[in-house]
Amino acid sequence: MATLKVSDSVPAPSDDAEQLRTAFEGWGTNEDLIISILAHRSAEQRKVIRQAYHETYGEDLLKTLDKELSNDFERAILLWTLEPGERDALLANEATKRWTSSNQVLMEVACTRTSTQLLHARQAYHARYKKSLEEDVAHHTTGDFRKLLVSLVTSYRYEGDEVNMTLAKQEAKLVHEKIKDKHYNDEDVIRILSTRSKAQINATFNRYQDDHGEEILKSLEEGDDDDKFLALLRSTIQCLTRPELYFVDVLRSAINKTGTDEGALTRIVTTRAEIDLKVIGEEYQRRNSIPLEKAITKDTRGDYEKMLVALLGEDDA
């Protein structure tokens, strides 16, 4: 469930564009007005506001926001105002500019989006960067990371609920044998993770637990803690089977470490507010005994804090 609260009475896009223009004029930017508008509009509404702003003022709203705002607040507003496919393309491109730690972002985009959402991200990547996402991922990665990540970002999974229980039994056995032999990079393991539907993967790993007496993630914990590929494999499985638990882990790490990881915090809130941030928040509170909103407000300040709280649906609007 989403946390985004869209206003009951939404003005015309031209009116929103005019109000945003007003927020940029004068001696100082009116950040509260910007939040009151953009943080309470759906992706489609934000898209139309951008179009109206461009038609009326001959400027790209994103460029104006970039010029008027700064720091973490600017990042949150810009990510939020982008269309979801554009946003994922940007996040993925940024990840290909960095090294190992960014592999998780590529995996996250590939595994927590629907097939259609991932396709839109790849199309947006083509349009924005004049090359393919898989091309940049292949260039950015090597070895086992390349095999896994290129397979994941090029995936187009069946989205239905139908599963083949015979296949689940066969592949649970196959995966168990590979894990037992520590062949974590086996092509069949990568094939299963990158081509099977999420329903089929869940059926396979449920059968794995039934047949072998422990969850697959528990089996993978027996590997080398310093093995970065194994860590990415664990995160991949978690994203495909229980994404809310993956996001809780990322949020907890982002908020609880010395010095907040605003990049991860902003990414999760802006990408999940229209999808399942309510479920993530409930799981966060269950596991950490503190509401997500309270954890965030303890570690953030100013307009950045106000924006995140608004996307959590916890402001007064």
Swiss-Prot record:
Disruption phenotype: Plants are hypersensitive to osmotic stress and abscisic acid (ABA) during germination and early seedling growth.
Positions of post-translational Phosphoserine modification: S102, S155, S289
Keywords assigned: Acetylation, Annexin, Calcium, Calcium/phospholipid-binding, Cytoplasm, Membrane, Metal-binding, Phosphoprotein, Repeat, Stress response
A single GO cellular-component term on record: plasma membrane
Chain positions with Phosphotyrosine modification: Y129, Y156, Y284
Post-translational modification (record): Phosphorylated.
BP GO terms, sorted: calcium ion transmembrane transport; phloem sucrose unloading; potassium ion export across plasma membrane; primary root development; response to abscisic acid; response to cold; response to heat; response to osmotic stress
Free-text tissue specificity from the UniProt record: Ubiquitous. Most abundant in stems.
GO molecular function annotations of the record: ATP binding; calcium ion binding; calcium-dependent phospholipid binding; copper ion binding; peroxidase activity; protein homodimerization activity; zinc ion binding
InterPro entries, A to Z: Annexin, Annexin_repeat, Annexin_repeat_CS, Annexin_sf, AnnexinD_plant
pH dependence: Active at pH 7.0 and 9.0, but not at pH 5.5.
Induction of synthesis: Up-regulated by cold, dehydration, salt, osmotic and oxidative stresses. Up-regulated by abscisic acid (ABA) and salicylic acid (SA).
Spans of repeat Annexin: 11-82, 83-154, 166-238, 242-313
This protein's record includes keyword Repeat: yes
Ligand binding (Ca(2+) 2): I255, G259, D299
UniProt keyword Glycoprotein, yes or no: no
PANTHER family, A to Z: ANNEXIN, ANNEXIN D1
Entry's family note: Belongs to the annexin (TC 1.A.31.1) family.
Comment, domains: A pair of annexin repeats may form one binding site for calcium and phospholipid.
Function recorded in the entry: Has a peroxidase activity. May act in counteracting oxidative stress. May also mediate regulated, targeted secretion of Golgi-derived vesicles during seedling development.
Subunit structure: Monomer and homodimer.
Protein name: Annexin D1
Lineage summary: Eukaryota, Viridiplantae, Streptophyta, Embryophyta, Tracheophyta
Gene name of the encoded protein: ANN1
